[in-house]
UniProtKB/Swiss-Prot annotation:
PANTHER family: TRANSCRIPTION FACTOR BHLH89, TRANSCRIPTION FACTOR BHLH91. Homodimer. It is found in: Nucleus. Gene3D superfamilies: Helix-loop-helix DNA-binding domain. The lineage of its organism: Eukaryota, Viridiplantae, Streptophyta, Embryophyta, Tracheophyta. This is Transcription factor bHLH89. Residues 212-261 form the bHLH domain. One of its GO terms (molecular function) is protein dimerization activity. It comes from Arabidopsis thaliana.
Length: 420
């Protein structure tokens, strides 16, 4: 192989250097022989001709002749004349070796691989034109492991399992292989995958990112409407006789019913205390005693009302789709007012209810207003009776509703008695 070819293939030759400097550096007797740099090693060593001869005569590895050939070309350029003469004699002995003829066919390929493995010492302009393949392998934190991999085989440094798949480069957002919120930690050449979420500290802030697992569930407008509708339905079922289905009417009737219940409770308390007072009178105890102390506010209020001759007063009203009942109690007098459609003879049935409640019926009046009949009953509470307004109204409504449904089923209506 010619000298010109050697100058072009060896990477350490500088074509821009002048000829005078090349000749002076090549034939200067005071300059020591050049040092050989081993790829992937941190130290350089000087080689002698004996080591070089032993290096060429080893037939075990096919890559050794290629290394020796490259070393010979480099010494031919930079060595002194004395070293050149000794080197030619050693090369003559090597060519006479029988094993050299068998291995010479592999020298050219090995030499080309060795040149490709050599470091590039060209100028920065040539480095800028070099395009390296994009590797998907992660970088190694330990430099010793990286040197071993680079010097072991050329296929390790040049082969990339994912390069032929032409995967796009990942954005520099701290993600690895497209997996979000994961980090890669290298510990003595071992890649450890761990979840970033487990290492985050709770700083008291509600994060609404993609990694948040807890999500607040807010009810929709449709669910709220269904919820309110169910609640109004339950409230309507608590009212004894609702008249309308709209929400405003349901709320109004519920308020009236609550007030009615409060009045009924007060009435019950007064009736109970009144019975106790009468029982004491029968046993001969003085009800009105200056030294008597009331055990409760109800008893005290009952005694005050009796001293002042206060009157018992209660009022209650019930409504349904076909009947309205109004009951008022003043002391021991009861007034019952009924308004109903012309379907049944309500006068007879209401009179039976008054008799069952132990009320003394004193007066009955009636009138016809359009398609409705109106009746007014005046009665008096018998002595010892504990009747109250809610009991009277509920009983009257129950009887009238039953008779009205029977009249509708039989399709037989009766006109109530009306007086002038």
């Amino acid at each position: 192989m010619g000298g010109g070819g050697m100058f072009e293939e060896i990477g350490c030759f500088d074509p821009n250097a002048p000829a005078e400097m090349t000749a002076e550096s090549s034939f200067s007797p005071s300059e020591p022989p050049p040092t050989i740099t081993v790829i992937g090693s941190n130290s350089n060593s000087n080689c002698s001709l004996e080591d070089l001869s032993a290096f060429h005569l080893s037939p075990q590895d096919s890559s050794l002749p290629a290394s020796a050939s490259a070393y010979a070309h480099q010494l031919h350029i930079n060595a002194t004349p004395n070293c050149d003469h000794q080197f030619q004699s050693s090369m003559h002995q090597t060519l006479q070796d029988p094993s050299y003829a068998q291995q010479s066919n592999h020298w050219d390929n090995g030499y080309q691989d060795f040149v490709n493995l050599g470091p590039n010492h060209t100028t920065p302009d040539l480095l800028s034109l070099l395009q390296l393949p994009r590797s998907s392998l992660p970088p190694f934190a330990n430099p010793s492991i990286q040197d071993i991999i680079m010097t072991t085989s050329s296929s390790v440094a040049a082969y990339d399992p994912l390069f032929h798949l032409n995967f796009p480069l990942q954005p520099p957002n701290g993600s690895f292989m497209g997996v979000d919120q994961d980090q890669t930690e290298t510990n003595q050449g071992v890649n450890l995958m761990y979840d970033e979420e487990n290492n985050n500290l709770d700083d008291g802030l509600n994060r609404k990112g993609r990694g948040s697992k807890k999500r607040k569930i807010f009810p929709t407008e449709r669910e709220r409407r269904v919820h309110f509708k169910d609640r109004f339905g339950d409230l309507k079922n608590l009212i004894p006789n609702p008249t309308k289905n709209d929400r405003a009417s349901i709320v109004g009737e519920a308020i009236d019913y609550i007030k009615e219940l409060l009045r009924t409770i007060d009435e019950f308390k007064l009736l109970v205390e009144k019975k106790r007072v009468k029982q004491r009178n029968r046993e001969g105890d003085d009800v009105v005693d200056e030294n008597f102390k009331a055990q409760s506010e109800v008893v005290e209020q009952c005694l005050i009302n009796k001293k002042n001759n206060a009157l018992r007063c209660s009022w209650l009203k019930r409504k349904s789709k076909f009947t309205d009942v109004d009951v008022r109690i003043i002391d021991d007098e009861v007034t019952i007012k009924i308004v109903q459609k012309k379907k049944i003879n309500c006068l007879l049935f209401v009179s039976k209810v008054v008799d069952q409640l132990e009320l003394d019926l004193h007066h009955v009046a009636g009138a016809q207003i359009g398609e409705h009949h109106s009746f007014l009953f005046n009665a008096k509470i018998s002595e010892g009776s504990s009747v109250y307004a809610s009991a009277i109204a509920d009983r009257v409504m129950e009887v009238l509703k039953k008779q009205y449904m029977e009249a509708l089923s039989a399709n037989n209506g009766y006109h109530c008695y009306s007086s002038d």
